[in-house]
Structure formats: structure tokens, C-alpha cells
From Swiss-Prot:
Keywords: Amino-acid biosynthesis, ATP-binding, Cytoplasm, Glycosyltransferase, Histidine biosynthesis, Magnesium, Metal-binding, Nucleotide-binding, Transferase. GO terms for biological process: L-histidine biosynthetic process. Its main location: cytoplasm. This is ATP phosphoribosyltransferase. It is an enzyme of class 2 (transferase). GO terms for molecular function: ATP binding; ATP phosphoribosyltransferase activity; magnesium ion binding. Gene3D superfamilies: 3.30.70.120, Periplasmic binding protein-like II. The keyword Transferase applies.
């Protein structure tokens, strides 16, 4: 296969993960015109091609070197890795960064009216799942024998349909489980999205572009986790007020016009500033407190 000079990134073609992946690239300054029916999109301002595919195809495309990067849920990534390893294949890739979206958990659930005293209750149970290898690894670690019922969709209906005693499926809010008369009893895996790279070495130009994207992603994620705080503080209360601000290193102190008793403080806080903290700041003597979102950060 001829090596493309453009960086190829695989991402999910539809759904929430697709939307969040698109938003991340946009925040990183990648201009892409994504049309609903097009499976390949081209960046307007960078040598980047976006391949929009099924999520469970993304790990294989990266493992096999068809694409350079992939944005994928860790649950899908590790399930495919375990599948290939079980078939005797060697899996090589680089996990570049965990991303701050796509969070979910892979859990075992049973009918709500059944008692549950621990994982040993599932001995010899038939468990329906779309993640047989992650489930098998967990149950082996727990020393519990079970039977697998592999399904590719609608896993939550398996107990009612008489196909299984329990299920192992992705859970976000738990509403789907409740709607199907199930309750969560074991969390076996916690997942977020991640950025992965093929193992084969990239050209210097491509690697430089990957490094640039990584720097921008780091800046986007740091900005999302940070707030820019401005306030007025009495000079004698600076130390007390600074101690109340979470994650602050070196505040910028500026004089105030026409008031020598106070200064202006500008700080970047690496943690969320809650109402309780703002009330504590006010009680300590701070005034004119502003908390602003940060769009981008670098350095």
C-alpha cells in the first residue's frame, strides 16, 4: 500500500463519540467539513484525512497500519486487543493520550428481584455480553466459572427473553438497566475515549503534525479543567484568600486605582470553583469575584 503523505485519523462515523471527537478536532484548530453521507473528510487547513467508520473497526485499522491515529473508547480498544491475542496475534500500537469524554463503565447486571451477595453468586451463570473477552478476564481474576452468551446488540433484554441469567454491558446513567428490570451488581471496567497511534514509525512530517495535535489537545483539556479567576482582595488577607483557591500556584497581583488598601488578583485555578468556595472568599474579604471559562491554554 502506498504511504499517504496526509495524516489519516479514524473516528466513529455517528453517535455521541463522533460528535465529541469532531468537537475536539475543531477546538484544536482543524477545519473539517463533515457531511452526513461522506465516509472520508479532508481538513481544509492541515494535511489530515478523517475516516468515519464503525467504532469496532477503529482498533484494527490502527493495529494494521491502515490509519495513523484513531479516537476510540478504551472498552472497544481493549476488547479487540484481547480478541486478537486470543487468536495468537501480536498487537502493537501506541496509546498517546486519554481523552476527557466518552466516559462509561462495563458492568454486570442481574434482574432486580434477585438477591446478590457477591461475585460467587454468578458461578455457572449464563451472562450475555458484547464484550466476552473483558468479561472472561474479569471472571478469571475473580476465580468464578461462567458461561458466555455473546450478543452484538440489545443485551439488556437477554434475561427477560430467557437467553441469560445476567448481562455485562456498558452503563452510563443506569436508566436503560432500570427500564429493563435490571440492577448493576459489579463494575468490571471503567472506560474513556483515547487517542491511539499505529506502531509503525511515521514520516518526520507526520510525526511533527501528531506532536502538534497532542500539544493542542493537552491545551484544550487543561482549559476545560481550569478557570480564570479575578477578584479584589485586601492586602492583609492575600495569604488567606490564596489558600482558599484550589490548584493555584502563582497569582498575579495588580494595584487598584484609587484604593491602596486592596489589590486585584488574577489566577488560573486547575480545579472547579464551587459556590461554597466563592462564599468563603467573600467572607475572607474578597470582592468583585469573577470566574471565567478558558478556551485554550499553552505553556
Amino acid at each position: 500500500m502506498i504511504e499517504s503523505k496526509r495524516l489519516r485519523i479514524a473516528m466513529q462515523k455517528s453517535g455521541r463519540l463522533s460528535q465529541e471527537s469532531q468537537a475536539l478536532l475543531k477546538q484544536c484548530g482543524v477545519k473539517i467539513n463533515l457531511q452526513e453521507q461522506r465516509l472520508i473528510a479532508y481538513a481544509e487547513n492541515m494535511p489530515i484525512d478523517i475516516l468515519r467508520v464503525r467504532d469496532d473497526d477503529i482498533p484494527g485499522l490502527v493495529f494494521d497500519g491502515v490509519v495513523d491515529l484513531g479516537i476510540i473508547g478504551e472498552n472497544v480498544l481493549e476488547e479487540e486487543e484481547l480478541t486478537r491475542q486470543a487468536a495468537g496475534e501480536t498487537v502493537n500500537y501506541k496509546k498517546l493520550r486519554r481523552l476527557d469524554f466518552g466516559g462509561c463503565r462495563l458492568s454486570i447486571a442481574i434482574p432486580q428481584d434477585e438477591a446478590y451477595n457477591g461475585i460467587s453468586d454468578l458461578k455457572n451463570a449464563r451472562i450475555a455480553t458484547s464484550y466476552p473477552n473483558l468479561l472472561k478476564r474479569y471472571m478469571q481474576q475473580q476465580g468464578v466459572d461462567f458461561k458466555t452468551c455473546s450478543l452484538t446488540g440489545s443485551v439488556e433484554v437477554a434475561p427477560r427473553a430467557g437467553l441469560a441469567d445476567a448481562i455485562c454491558d456498558l452503563v452510563s446513567s443506569g436508566a436503560t438497566l432500570e427500564a429493563n428490570g435490571l440492577k448493576e451488581v459489579e463494575i468490571i471496567y471503567r472506560s474513556k475515549s483515547c487517542l491511539i497511534q499505529r506502531a509503525a514509525e511515521l514520516s518526520p512530517e507526520k510525526q511533527a503534525l501528531v506532536d502538534k495535535l497532542l500539544t493542542r489537545i493537552q491545551g484544550v483539556q487543561q482549559a476545560a479543567e481550569s478557570k480564570y479567576i479575578m477578584l479584589h482582595a485586601p492586602k492583609e488577607k492575600l495569604e488567606e484568600i490564596t489558600a482558599l483557591l484550589p490548584g493555584v500556584e502563582n497569582p498575579t497581583i495588580l494595584p487598584l486605582a484609587h484604593d491602596n488598601s486592596k489589590v486585584a488578583m488574577h489566577v488560573v485555578s486547575q480545579e472547579n470553583l464551587f459556590w461554597e468556595t466563592m462564599e468563603q472568599l467573600k467572607d475572607a474579604g474578597a470582592s468583585s469575584i469573577l470566574v471565567l471559562p478558558i478556551e485554550k491554554m499553552m505553556g
